[in-house]
């Protein structure tokens, strides 16, 4: 098995820590909040407020299930438009109260069903991109598993984007890429090699800012590592003048 094939397999492993796992281990007094105030509460998107030591933060994440029934409830981590609208509601609330935003991303992509499209899936994603680019609080996005397409980017317009060592981030799935390029989805590993989807490759291309190592560490050690990095970077971002924070975020994405 090639290194890319191994990473692809690990990124999709059902046993990986979820967004709620990270929230409950990183933040004190974490309280989950629900609903988009328009249509429904999407189980694929979770969010709430808590304390990173003494820093009040807002957390938003895409949640995959840990077993079949949970996956059905979470729609296998594929958000509907109401999920993205819930995320935006919580992020605008964070801006109102001056709370830094931390997002955890693990999705193959936004849900492509008829109902989701009828309720404005494309608009919901585009609205998040537009609004996040100008939110007046620090934003850090962490890709903890799969980072698939616009469904992932809708929570990743951030001042810094981090990836776990065995996560992936791509415009579409390797299977989808292989199906388009060669009409053969079984060539997914070959496609993944071409797509440059691993943390190491994306860091080299400056698409992401930090890699969180996994190999040789227990999950509790990874959480502690993330916590220390978050405290350092949030304090640094909060020290910037607002104009500089927003300009840096803008230039980060313009440079692509």
Curated annotation (Swiss-Prot):
Keywords: ATP-binding, Cytoplasm, Fatty acid biosynthesis, Fatty acid metabolism, Lipid biosynthesis, Lipid metabolism, Nucleotide-binding, Transferase. GO terms for molecular function: acetyl-CoA carboxylase activity; ATP binding; carboxyl- or carbamoyltransferase activity. Pathway: Lipid metabolism; malonyl-CoA biosynthesis; malonyl-CoA from acetyl-CoA: step 1/1. Component of the acetyl coenzyme A carboxylase (ACC) complex. First, biotin carboxylase catalyzes the carboxylation of biotin on its carrier protein (BCCP) and then the CO(2) group is transferred by the carboxyltransferase to acetyl-CoA to form malonyl-CoA. This is Acetyl-coenzyme A carboxylase carboxyl transferase subunit alpha. Transmembrane segments: none annotated. NCBIfam families: accA, AccA_sub, PRK05724.1, PRK12319.1. Belongs to the AccA family. Residues 1-236 form the CoA carboxyltransferase C-terminal domain. GO terms for biological process: fatty acid biosynthetic process; malonyl-CoA biosynthetic process. It is found in: Cytoplasm. Acetyl-CoA carboxylase is a heterohexamer composed of biotin carboxyl carrier protein (AccB), biotin carboxylase (AccC) and two subunits each of ACCase subunit alpha (AccA) and ACCase subunit beta (AccD). HAMAP family: AcetylCoA_CT_alpha (MF_00823). One of its GO terms (cellular component) is acetyl-CoA carboxylase complex. Its EC number is 2.1.3.15. It catalyses: N(6)-carboxybiotinyl-L-lysyl-[protein] + acetyl-CoA = N(6)-biotinyl-L-lysyl-[protein] + malonyl-CoA. Pfam families: ACCA (PF03255).
């Amino acid at each position: 098995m090639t290194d890319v094939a191994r990473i692809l397999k690990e990124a999709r492993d059902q046993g990986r820590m979820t967004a709620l796992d990270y929230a409950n281990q990183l933040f004190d007094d974490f309280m989950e909040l629900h609903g988009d105030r328009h249509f429904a509460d999407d189980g694929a998107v979770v969010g709430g407020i808590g304390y990173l030591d003494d820093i009040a933060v807002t957390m938003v994440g895409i949640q995959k299930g840990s077993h079949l029934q949970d996956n059905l409830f979470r729609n296998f981590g594929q958000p509907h438009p109401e999920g993205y609208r819930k995320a935006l509601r919580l992020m605008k609330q964070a801006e109102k109260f001056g709370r830094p935003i931390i997002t955890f991303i693990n999705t193959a992509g936004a849900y492509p069903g008829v109902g989701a499209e009828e309720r404005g899936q494309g608009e919901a994603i585009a609205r998040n991109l537009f609004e996040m680019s100008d939110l007046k609080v620090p934003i850090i996005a962490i890709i903890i598993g799969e980072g698939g397409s616009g469904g992932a980017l809708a929570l990743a317009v951030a001042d810094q984007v981090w990836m776990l060592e065995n996560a992936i981030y791509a415009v579409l799935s390797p299977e989808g890429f292989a199906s388009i390029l060669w009409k053969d989805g079984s060539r997914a590993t070959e496609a993944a090699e071409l797509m440059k989807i691993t943390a190491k490759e994306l860091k080299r291309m400056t698409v992401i800012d930090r890699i969180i190592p996994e190999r040789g560490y227990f999950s509790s050690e990874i959480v502690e590592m993330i916590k220390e990095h978050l405290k350092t970077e949030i304090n640094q971002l909060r020290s910037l003048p607002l104009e500089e924070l927003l300009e840096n975020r803008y230039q980060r994405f313009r440079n692509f």
